[in-house]
Amino acid sequence: MGKPPSRHPEERGGEADKPRRTTALSSFEGDLRSPPQGDGGQTRCGFIALIGAPNAGKSTLTNALVGSKVTIVSRKVQTTRALVRGIAIAGAAQLVLIDTPGIFAPRRRLDRAMVTTAWGSAHDADIVVLLIDANKGVDEEADAILAKLGEVRQPKVLVLNKIDIVDKPALLTLAQKLNAEATFDATFMLSAATGSGVEDLKRWLAEHSPAGPWHYPEDQISDAPMRSLAAEITREKLFNRLHQELPYQATVETDVWKELRDGSARIEQTIYVERESQRKIVLGKSGATIKAIGAEARKEIAALTEQA
């Protein structure tokens, strides 16, 4: 057994604005309204698994489809370690978006578990969306995914992401190559970062989701509690600031979320790292790094709770 992880409380007493109503991301209080009815008075609900290589843009696309931040985005690979469900509404359809860990050739046990989780989500979903970084094209990771994709029986959609930085002729060639290697029910070219083409994909997913009742209230955008999302936001800021210096195993936990009388909230978090040397990196000189991370996280958490 190794030593327990070093820990340092993220700047105690951080405050974020209190939500305007008591609606957490994972719960709903108040009157439940019936969802809008589609043609023939029928609602739809589809579980959509987003799979792809690390940094293909799955988390960015999840946020774009939902219209709000429900999963963190970082340059660092494998920042999505568990299944994240974002919930989007498109007319009479509810789309439960499963943002999965990136699929690659794993070496460590944790990596193998994450890749297994991603493929398990694909087999359990109603529709599978494969994201390809159009700027990278078909590399070894994409080839490995395509080779195994044939085992998935669900409808499959190919999405070429990051089209804002790729020439159109190259996109068309890439789309033809990928469709020759695997069978897809539809192909979309979009930019999750700019939003271009996202609505077309959303509309298709809604139209092809199975008929059935919604699984979540209309106002809910994620199945994660707000305190969990707050921890993930701090982890995102941590990785964005210390991209090279910190392993992705670093974690953040929200220990306290207390709403105060003045309408703010007191949030206390703990950052866990593996070694004392990493603790010093997170702290920075005279605590400058941890203070900057805390300030960035508080700003985003405050904005998110105001729109929740």
Task: Indicate residue ranges for each PLM-predicted region.
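Canonical P-loop GTPase G-domain recognition
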Residues: 155, 164-222
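Conserved C-terminal guanine-recognition region of P-loop GTPase G domains, centered on the G4
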Residues: 92, 116-187, 258-261
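Conserved G1/Walker A P-loop phosphate-binding module
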Residues: 28, 41-116, 120-122
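Conserved, well-folded catalytic cores of nucleic-acid-processing
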Residues: 68, 87-91, 121-128, 152, ...
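Intrinsic disorder/low-complexity segments
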Residues: 1-42
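Residue-level signature of catalytic and energy-coupling elements of molecular machines
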Residues: 51, 55, 61, 84, ...
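Conserved glycine(s) of the Walker
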Residues: 57, 197, 289
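P-loop NTP-binding site
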Residues: 226-308
